[in-house]
Each structure stands twice: as structure tokens, then as C-alpha cells.
């Protein structure tokens, strides 16, 4: 497989929309939504922190320096953008809580502000978040492009969007996935095991994005062409599908087609199951009750079946499935964007957008779908 970055297909077919977006504290805000309510009792203080111009790891370093707490004692649910105004929850041993208020000015000097203090019985761990609320401000937006953007947002609010990994997974030079493959091939290795694991996960992410783009291509072909033309297409690709199945696929109202053997999952979380009744699962997908998942290949990965597996095989890799420390998993192919709000400020030529995404989904994927700009792999959030 070609490891150079290829353009990823969009879900919708509108022309590109021209505007300017700058990932900055003024124009990009991220607010973490916790996975559970905090009990207000327990041995761990839980603080909500607002930061600007700092990565999460830089923020943790500041807390360690000011409070004298070891970084290993600090808990956080996920990494938040540096070039944004963000809020997130941090846990630390209860004994450090009295030092928080005493050091308010020291935190403010570092662009940190503690918004709330609570307590809980366990440390916050990676993944302990429900999702994130986002705010984005687009500039140099004409009234016509604002109208186009609203129309695109209506489609996205109705059907959702592709759950592509954002380019921060792939590094400044878009080559992390190549380094990950070299590690799997024993051509290179780094001293820090976490770095090795991250680079391997970048390769998984690259394959996932490529598979998702391929599935979008197939969905578009099914929708655009007749059953007879589709039969010829699938025959040329050596994919097994009959005319009755193609009729069922064409009748699915959602732009992303559910194929026989897809690994589905109840949305936004739940158990995996195989898509066997295509009409039924297509309707449930349209109602946002379930969603199809894509492969993150690894030793214990769950694989698709039937037609879905025939397509997925191209994006499997025996070095991933045999790598002892790469277990593998599934990731939603598709996510539903919630609480979409927008406002066009004509006198400033600015468009303000608010929305919610579940954990693991990227605001850059939404920006990509709105903007339809070539070379979107340069996004940084």
C-alpha cells in the first residue's frame, strides 16, 4: 500500500467553501464533558482547569512545579489542544487541595485558572470523558458562503459525518504512520515504549482513514449508478454482491451504506454485532441508534465478515495482527454531531459555530467536511 498521504473523500458533494480559520484561544474553544458526576467525597481532588496557549502535558508540568505533586499522581482524561482556550478536569491527591487557592496568582501567570473544585473516590484516567463541546469562529466569510455553510451543517446534523482521525495523529510532517510501520518491521525503534506504541497507533489510524475513505467511495458509487452498473463495478473489483443486495443498498436513505458483515455497535456505546439484516440496520443507523465500525488492526481485533470483510482485507496487516503489544479494536466509521448552533455576524464577516462530539472524534474532521478544501491533512487540531 502507498504510505503517502492521499486525499480523503468527503461525505457530501458541495463545492469548496472559502473562509479563514485560525486555531487560537479567541477562535477555538474546547470544553471537556466528564464521563460521570463527581461524588464530592473521596481521596482525590478534582479540579476544572481553563488553560490557554498550553498543551495538557505542559499544564501538568506547571501543576507539578507549583504544588510539588508528582506528575504520575495527576490524572486527566485526554489531551487538549494547545492553540485553543480549553477546559478539562484534573485529579490530584486530596492533600494538595489547600495549596490550590494559595497559588491562584501563580497559576494565572501561567495562563491557568481553576474554575471549580470537587472530590471523587478514584483518579481520573485516560478515556474518562464523555466528549467535548466545541466553539469555532470562521472569518472572512461572505453571506453566500455563510448560507452554504448552514446548508452543509443541516446535512451533518441530520446524517452525521465520517469519523476520520485528525492529522495530529500523524505529526508535523505527516509521517508518524511510516515510522510506526518501520517499528513493526524492526527497521527502527525508540527508547520510550510509549512513543513506539503511539507511532504504531498512527499506522493503525492511517489504515483506518484509508478504509473509511474507500467505504465512502463505494457508498457514493452505489448511490450514483444503476444496479446493472454496480454489478459490473463490483465484478471488476472481485467483490461478491448480487442484484437483490444492491437494490437494498441503494434503498438505504443514509449516504454511508451498511454492508453485509459490517461490525455494528450501539451508539454512542454498547456491544458489537454483525450486520446481517441490511434493511433493518440501515433504518437503525438513520435513527442514530447504531453505527458501523472500522478496523484498528491488532492481535485481538474483531474482523468484519462477508462483503465487508472482502473490502477490509486490503487494510489489514499481518505485522499488526501478530504484534504482541498491539491488541487492536474497532472505531466508529461514523459519528453524529450534536447540539449544532450557528450564527453569522455579517458586519464582521464572521461565522460562529458550536457543537458537541463524542470522545475520540476530531473537530478537524467537521472542518474538513464543511470546507471541502484540497490538502486538508495540514489541520492542526
Curated annotation (Swiss-Prot):
Active-site residues (renumbered): 81
EC class name: isomerase
Keywords linked to the UniProt accession: Isomerase, tRNA processing
Catalyzed chemical reaction(s): uridine(13) in tRNA = pseudouridine(13) in tRNA
UniProt keyword tRNA processing, yes or no: yes
Gene3D superfamilies for this protein: TruD, catalytic domain
InterPro entries per record: PsdUridine_synth_cat_dom_sf, PsdUridine_synth_TruD, PsdUridine_synth_TruD_CS, PsdUridine_synth_TruD_insert, TruD_catalytic, TruD_pseudoU_synthase
Occurrences of domain TRUD (ranges): 160-335
SUPFAM superfamilies: Pseudouridine synthase (SSF55120)
GO cellular component: cytosol
NCBIfam families from the UniProt entry: PRK00984.1-3, tRNA_TruD_broad
PANTHER family: TRNA PSEUDOURIDINE SYNTHASE D
Name of protein: tRNA pseudouridine synthase D
Encoding gene (name): truD
Amino acid at each position: 500500500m502507498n504510505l503517502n498521504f492521499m486525499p480523503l473523500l468527503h461525505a457530501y458533494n458541495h463545492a469548496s467553501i472559502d473562509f479563514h480559520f485560525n486555531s487560537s484561544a479567541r477562535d477555538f474553544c474546547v470544553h471537556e464533558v466528564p464521563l460521570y458526576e463527581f461524588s464530592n467525597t473521596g481521596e482525590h481532588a478534582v479540579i476544572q482547569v481553563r488553560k490557554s496557549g498550553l498543551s495538557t502535558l505542559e499544564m501538568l508540568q506547571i501543576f507539578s512545579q507549583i504544588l510539588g505533586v508528582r506528575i504520575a499522581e495527576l490524572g486527566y482524561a485526554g489531551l487538549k489542544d494547545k492553540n485553543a482556550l480549553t477546559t478539562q478536569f484534573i485529579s490530584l491527591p486530596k492533600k494538595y487541595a489547600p495549596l490550590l487557592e494559595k497559588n491562584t496568582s501563580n497559576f494565572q501567570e501561567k495562563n491557568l485558572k481553576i474554575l471549580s473544585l470537587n472530590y471523587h473516590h478514584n483518579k481520573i484516567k485516560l478515556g474518562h470523558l464523555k466528549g467535548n463541546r466545541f466553539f469555532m469562529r470562521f472569518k472572512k466569510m461572505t453571506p453566500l458562503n455563510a448560507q452554504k455553510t448552514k446548508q452543509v451543517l443541516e446535512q451533518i446534523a441530520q446524517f452525521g459525518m465520517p469519523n476520520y482521525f485528525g492529522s495530529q495523529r500523524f505529526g508535523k510532517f505527516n509521517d508518524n504512520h511510516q515510522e510506526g510501520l518501520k517499528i513493526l518491521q524492526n527497521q527502527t525503534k525508540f527508547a520510550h515504549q510509549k512513543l513506539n506504541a503511539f507511532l504504531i497507533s498512527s499506522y493503525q489510524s492511517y489504515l483506518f482513514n484509508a478504509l473509511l475513505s474507500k467505504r465512502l467511495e463505494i457508498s457514493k458509487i452505489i448511490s450514483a449508478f444503476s444496479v446493472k452498473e454496480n454489478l459490473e463495478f463490483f465484478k471488476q473489483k472481485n467483490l461478491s454482491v448480487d442484484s437483490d443486495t444492491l437494490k437494498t443498498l441503494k434503498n438505504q436513505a443514509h449516504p454511508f451504506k451498511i454492508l453485509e458483515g459490517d461490525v455494528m455497535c450501539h451508539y454512542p456505546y454498547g456491544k458489537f454485532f454483525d450486520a446481517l439484516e441490511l434493511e433493518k440496520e440501515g433504518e437503525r443507523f438513520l435513527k442514530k441508534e447504531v453505527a458501523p465500525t472500522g478496523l484498528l488492526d491488532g492481535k485481538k481485533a474483531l474482523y468484519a465478515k462477508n462483503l465487508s470483510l472482502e473490502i477490509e482485507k486490503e487494510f489489514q496487516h499481518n505485522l499488526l495482527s501478530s504484534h504482541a503489544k498491539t491488541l487492536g479494536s474497532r472505531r466508529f466509521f461514523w459519528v453524529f454531531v450534536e447540539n449544532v448552533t450557528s450564527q453569522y455576524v455579517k458586519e464582521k464577516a464572521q461565522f460562529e459555530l458550536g457543537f458537541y462530539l463524542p470522545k475520540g472524534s476530531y473537530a478537524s474532521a467537521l472542518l474538513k467536511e464543511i470546507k471541502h478544501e484540497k490538502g486538508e491533512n495540514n489541520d492542526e487540531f
